[in-house]
Amino acid sequence: MKRNVSTVIVTLAVAFSAQLLPARSTTISRANTNQSKAFLATETFDGDYREIPKTSIARDGTKIASVKSYKDLHSLLVTLPPDEAMRSKYPGLRKSVKKPNWPAQREPEEIRNVRIKSCWIVSAKHEGGDGDRDFHVVVSNSPTNFSEVMNAEVSGLPKANTADFNTLRDVRALFLTLSTNAPSSSFTHLKPPKHVILEGSLYFDGYHGAGKKNDPGPAWAKPQSVWEIHPIYKLTPLN
């Protein structure tokens, strides 16, 4: 009889403890998520390839270049020079080129700031680990048809407190509020997509190719050009 009573007591104690664990675990998880987002919002750029263009807003001389608006992503894409033409005109943008022969500053075609009045963020990933700390953001002309997409990037912050530091820090923090969880190291499919107005500087990523299996982007929404908006310096959510 004593053994039965002891067994019942132990069973009840284990069951009671198990009921407490999920609530405690959830609290820790939420704290970690918030702490992680706060850390991610202030990460410094840790890449090597063309650091200055990636971490600064396009300028015409000493002034920020004028902004041209486009009604949608398609309207911007049709204005971009073909990848092959850019690599032919600027040999430093070819994939085989090694440092220090990369263009340190923006080429003339990259000195363009653009505003897309309507596009959808459909996927994103974080370049952590050995990456440069950027967020790769795939934007689409449509929330359901991913035939026209482009890579845009929320840059890691400049190493020095430059003129654009606060702007890039603020857009990085805003980007992290668009979903409950921060993007992981692989492309996450955002459901539903985030409808936004997006503003940033054009950038030709000669380091990569486009459209093939190992090129940037998820298989279901893979950009067909290495043209990017990099950095994004303003985001306005529309939904």
Where are the regions a protein language model picked out?
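Bacterial N-terminal signal peptides that target proteins for export
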Residues: M1-I9
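OB-fold and OB-like single-stranded nucleic-acid-recognition modules
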Residues: R24-N239
